């Protein structure tokens, strides 16, 4: 077998320099593995080689998480070596084929570690530009833990694609979201684990296995903003029982929030147009109601955690997330339904006050549904004071600004990503970026105009896509009507934004400047950037320094 000479790839501006002896040996070893996979040397003893290999791979994963890449490479090397020796004395043909796939997988990861972290020569003061070492905040690496630590926890609830988990030792609850690893590390997409982002859910720890990354997230118990608004607008149809968790949450939130007030109808507006009929809640047979209120179902890498419904069994068996937990559908009066005529009250807003009001649709019933208002289901009315919307908007803006500063784009920010804490402040669901996780966008967010027009296209995305999403969410909060309902044919370059006459001038101006079809023309981009957005007249009463502090 011929030895392979290796020469390091120079960094920009640096002259090529020969590899160290250790790096040369690494290249030789990788070449030897390729030859041994092709030829094979049956020299394995009768020990259980799978157990020995599993020990080495587990150590490799732990070292990989903690960024000790040299040790991780060595453990992968040892594990592959054990598998190569054992596969030739294993009489089970199916197991041999499975082991070959594992060898290829571990070899690929070893090569990625070598190419990304061991081969590149570093000058003094230089830092790698790929993989976990790209993290701007180095202390975040201490959050990485071995996946075995999750064995002491049990699943007590399921919230669509995330799980509510209880620590058996402390009794505390947290949310776990799993991200599938593609095992093909993107050298263009860096791993970025945001830290210290105000008004965003905290990442407490993360765990890595061979196939997944598990995010251990803070449990925000206030639920989603949209579900809270709907329950405030229609308390008799929110599915709450006396003494429920959601009732206690509302009792805690009410001193902080004065969200809903009667809306003044515009002159010439027919009261009958605002009449809605509310269907009695229907529960899913797979999960008990447990007195919980409806909540918006999250979809994403977004890594979110609204209030969960609690499983009565407490079993760690993970049930498949049901298609719908609790349905609260608002429909136009007289609209037909499979469930028969709607029962319940009809509600007409009345009274007076300088508030924002309108007829708001919820979200599409898959990932964006507010457990009630879906596309084509009619309208549910809420009225929210502009000052309150302004506060929520400012908190969301601060979170997005911090994410952008750390290099993270949300891409498909939608109502399921906006939570409320116990003090009534916005908490964005967790967003991050992983080189081993292929980014995915919520299709319903794109269809319902929460995602920018350029999302899903071939052009490179910028911060402008999140400013569109920000504008789409504000549009729904301020007008009470979703952007996709006002513009069912979508928004093109020539589309004129539909705004109600009673909307304040600063609010109308902000929405118009955010919801520009051309990304470079959106407020928050170009000269002034986010500073210009924060200085918009709509935010004139916001004291940004106190908000961040």
Swiss-Prot record:
One term under GO cellular component:
ribosome
Where would I find the MIT domain in this sequence? 87-115
SUPFAM superfamilies per the UniProt record, alphabetical: MIT domain, Protein kinase-like (PK-like)
The record, for InterPro entries, names: Intracell_Sig-Traffick_Protein (IPR051866), Kinase-like_dom_sf (IPR011009), MIT_dom (IPR007330), MIT_dom_sf (IPR036181), Prot_kinase_dom (IPR000719), STK_RPK118-like (IPR035053)
* Catalytic activity annotation: L-seryl-[protein] + ATP = O-phospho-L-seryl-[protein] + ADP + H(+); L-threonyl-[protein] + ATP = O-phospho-L-threonyl-[protein] + ADP + H(+)
- Alphabetical UniProt keywords: ATP-binding, Kinase, Nucleotide-binding, Ribonucleoprotein, Ribosomal protein, Serine/threonine-protein kinase, Transferase
Stated EC number for the protein is: 2.7.11.1
What positions does the entry give for ATP binding? 151-159, 177
The source's superkingdom equals Eukaryota
Q: Which PROSITE patterns match?
A: PROTEIN_KINASE_DOM (PS50011)
- Please name the GO terms that the record assigns under molecular function: ATP binding; protein serine kinase activity; protein serine/threonine kinase activity
Protein kinase domain segment(s): 145-539
Cited Pfam families? MIT (PF04212), Pkinase (PF00069)
| Enzyme kind, highest EC tier | transferase
Task: List the catalytic residues.
Answer: 412 (proton acceptor)
Q: Where is this region: Disordered?
A: 260-325
Q: Which family does it belong to?
A: Belongs to the protein kinase superfamily. Ser/Thr protein kinase family. S6 kinase subfamily.
Protein name, entry field: Ribosomal protein S6 kinase-like 1
The source organism is Pongo abelii
Q: Which gene encodes it?
A: RPS6KL1
């Amino acid at each position: 077998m011929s030895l392979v000479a290796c020469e390091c790839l120079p960094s920009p501006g640096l002259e090529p320099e020969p590899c160290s002896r250790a790096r040369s040996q690494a290249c030789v070893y990788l070449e030897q593995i390729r030859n041994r996979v092709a030829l094979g040397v049956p020299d394995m003893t009768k020990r259980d080689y799978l157990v020995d290999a599993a020990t080495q791979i587990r150590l490799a994963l732990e070292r990989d998480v903690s960024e000790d890449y040299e040790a991780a490479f060595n453990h992968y090397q040892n594990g592959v070596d054990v598998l190569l020796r054992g596969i030739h004395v294993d009489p089970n043909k199916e197991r041999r084929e499975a082991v070959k796939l594992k060898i290829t997988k571990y070899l690929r990861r070893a090569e990625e570690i070598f190419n990304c972290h061991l081969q590149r020569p570093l000058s003094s003061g230089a830092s790698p530009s790929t993989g976990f070492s790209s993290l701007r905040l180095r202390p975040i690496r201490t959050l990485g833990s071995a996946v075995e630590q999750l064995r002491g926890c049990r699943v007590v609830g399921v919230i669509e694609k995330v799980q509510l988990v209880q620590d058996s030792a402390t009794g505390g609850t947290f949310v776990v979201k799993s991200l599938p690893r593609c095992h093909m590390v993107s050298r263009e997409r860096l791993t970025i684990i945001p830290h210290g982002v105000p008004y965003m859910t905290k990442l407490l720890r993360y765990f890595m296995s061979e196939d997944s990354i598990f995010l251990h997230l803070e449990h925000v118990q206030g639920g989603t903003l949209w579900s809270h608004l709907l329950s405030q607008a229609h308390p008799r149809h929110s599915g709450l029982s006396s003494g429920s968790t959601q009732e206690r949450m509302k009792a805690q939130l009410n001193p902080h929030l004065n969200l809903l007030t009667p809306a003044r109808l515009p002159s010439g507006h027919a009261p009958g147009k605002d009449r809605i009929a509310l269907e009695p809640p229907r529960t899913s047979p797979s999960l008990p109601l447990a007195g919980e209120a409806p909540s918006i179902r999250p979809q994403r890498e977004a890594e979110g955690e609204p209030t969960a419904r609690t499983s009565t069994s407490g079993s760690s068996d993970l049930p498949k997330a049901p298609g719908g937990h609790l349905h609260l559908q608002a429909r136009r009066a007289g609209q037909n339904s499979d469930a028969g005529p709607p029962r319940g009250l009809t509600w007409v807003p009345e009274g007076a006050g300088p508030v924002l009001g309108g007829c708001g649709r919820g979200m599409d019933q898959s990932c964006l549904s507010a457990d009630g208002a879906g596309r084509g289901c009619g309208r549910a009315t809420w009225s929210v004071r502009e000052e309150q919307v302004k506060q929520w908007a400012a908190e969301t803006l601060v979170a997005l600004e911090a994410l952008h500063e750390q290099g993270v784009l949300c891409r498909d920010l939608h109502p399921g990503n906006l939570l409320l804490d116990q003090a009534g402040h916005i908490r964005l669901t967790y967003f991050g970026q992983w080189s081993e996780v292929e980014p995915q966008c919520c299709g319903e967010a794109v269809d319902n105009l929460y995602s920018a027009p350029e999302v899903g296209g071939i052009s490179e995305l910028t911060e402008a896509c999140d400013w569109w999403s920000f504008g789409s969410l504000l549009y729904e909060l301020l007008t009470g009507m979703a952007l996709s309902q006002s513009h069912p044919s979508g928004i093109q370059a020539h589309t004129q934004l539909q705004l109600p006459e009673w909307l304040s001038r600063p609010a109308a101006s902000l929405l118009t400047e955010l919801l520009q079809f051309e990304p470079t023309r959106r407020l928050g981009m170009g000269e002034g950037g986010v500073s210009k957005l924060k200085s918009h007249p709509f935010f004139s009463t916001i004291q940004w320094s106190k908000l961040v502090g």
